Amino acid sequence: MFKKEPHIKALSNLKNSERKKLLQTFQKQTNNEEYSFRTSTIKQTNFNGQKSVGTVYTDENNTPILFKEKHKEQLFPTVYSCWEYPALLPIVLTHGFVIEEHLFNGANLMISGSIPPFDPRCKIGTLCGIASKQAPETVLAIGIVELDLPSFDKVIGETGVAVKIIHHFNDGLSKVFKMKLEPPFVLSTQSKDNNISSKQIESSEQIKAVEKEQEDVKEASVDVEEIAEVLDHFTVSDVDYFITRALYYTLTQDKGLELPISASNFISNHIMRNLPPIDHNEVNVKKTSWKKSAKFLKHFEKEGFLKLKGKGDDLTIVGKNTDKDELKNFVPYKLGCSKSATESRESTTSKEKTSGMMYSLTLYKPFNLAKDLLKEVNLASHTYYTSQDIRSAVSQYISVKNLADTKDKGKVIMDDLLFDMVNKKKKVLNASRIIARGEILHPLLTNNFTEFYQIFKSDDTLLFKAPMKGSLPHIKIITEMKIGRKVITRVSNFEVFQVDPESLAADLRKICSGSTTISESQTFKCAEVQVQGPHGQSIIDHLNKLGIPSKWIDFENKLKKKKRK
């Protein structure tokens, strides 16, 4: 419902009688008479979204707690209400990556992505919350049940929408109210209403169902006493799953794999390097159910994936079978941080982290022809890459297609794909097919990739849940003279760095000893703080203390010096 930020009007307080009526209605709809508003003041405003209009109710701190669509009586709680009252709604568990990669990107929860057993209250049409198995009491999405979930004992092989998502954490509703509350990830061994049991901790079977790979595995059972430990660390089944996925990736996507290859080389240089972005101290062959590399490889030889030679632990992989259904249906994933991305961050961190400043990373996402090039070198076409990643991909493509000029290794003879990518915006029919290697990357990035940026705090945590489209924005500071010879300094475009306008205005009142006002910037269509007097440098110093480096701040002084007579 809130894929984009809705337009909202000014908030107004509800009358006491309306407040009581609203509470009674919601208690009746949720069959929860214990629920109550945490503040005595409740506000309301109308919203106008992309596909719906309605009313939002907030507490006295302007935190949205309920909303409903126009001409409909159904009230939906927000995730913030569920954080205050964990037992407010029945909860459907799913996997963390399903929430991050799918639900937060606008998808509904499929039955194959959910974790049974289900709450008996989760009948068709029931309002429910969605939580991850790592934090089973922290609701991250709200939705309506579309299937009779209690009737499902297993979800492997099942299809259909389990829950239609209405609202989720950090969606347009959260953004329009500028919410900064973070989920209270409390890991507990048992839910307050005993509706979330230890059996809901996922098995490797259910993860594979999300990936649509149907394999016969043993379900992992976990005692109640072990749940806290399981929630803090990967289970053996989880480790088995990740190592198995790395094997599938190696057999289907790893161009560097050359057979025959020794077992130790196969594990260290291929399996471990083809893991998703997880801690290798937590996920390795020693922590699997096989314990040893030899047992792991012999298991998959028995399953028909590999062909081995040797005895005992001295094994050599001499063949592979890519006709297995699991490999045919395998969907590649983003590998752990690439060397170039890590180096980019480390080089930036070394310069900026020491001073406690934020730092940024420029990323690129392919479209059209770029996807074709990445497929040729077996890279995913739906993820983000650094410029160094793309440079390496282009070099690999040139090598695979034998495009290097035999007379001059510093030049490339472009094939049709590379030629179209480089000359996409040039309407030159007879352009040369020969180009210097160093001249390929810039037009290729400009023509075929969308630029994104991600900002990291000084402690290396992400400022945004996902990279933001476009180039890194700059804060604008202007000192000028208004009519009446009144000098002011304006600051704008700071909200992207999670600087609150009201907090900034309050700080500048103290620092600059002058009055401040908050208005809307005509240039950036965002909040603008104005303070009396020429305080450009003082504002820059304050922003530096907030972790924003000076190179991200543009200061313009429009005050003209008086000419001497």
From Swiss-Prot:
Domain SWIB/MDM2: 362-447
Further information: Present with 3870 molecules/cell in log phase SD medium.
Pfam families the record matches: Pre-PUA, SUI1, WH_eIF2D
Organism: Saccharomyces cerevisiae (strain ATCC 204508 / S288c) (Baker's yeast)
Any one Gene Ontology molecular-function term assigned to this protein's record: translation initiation factor activity
Domain-related comment: The PUA and the SUI1 domains may be involved in RNA binding.
InterPro entries for the chain: EIF2D (IPR039757), eIF2D_SUI1 (IPR039759), Pre-PUA (IPR041366), PUA-like_sf (IPR015947), PUA_eIF2d-like (IPR048248), SUI1 (IPR001950), SUI1_dom_sf (IPR036877), SWIB_MDM2_dom_sf (IPR036885)
GO BP annotation list: formation of translation preinitiation complex; rRNA processing
Subunit structure: Interacts with the 40S ribosomal subunit.
Domain PUA, first and last residues per copy: 89-170
Name of the protein: Translation machinery-associated protein 64
SUPFAM superfamilies to which the protein is assigned, alphabetical: eIF1-like (SSF55159), PUA domain-like (SSF88697), SWIB/MDM2 domain (SSF47592)
Family annotation (PANTHER family): EUKARYOTIC TRANSLATION INITIATION FACTOR 2D (PTHR12217:SF4)
Family (UniProt): Belongs to the eIF2D family.
Classification of source organism: Eukaryota, Fungi, Dikarya, Ascomycota, Saccharomycotina
Domain (SUI1): residue spans on this chain: 475-547
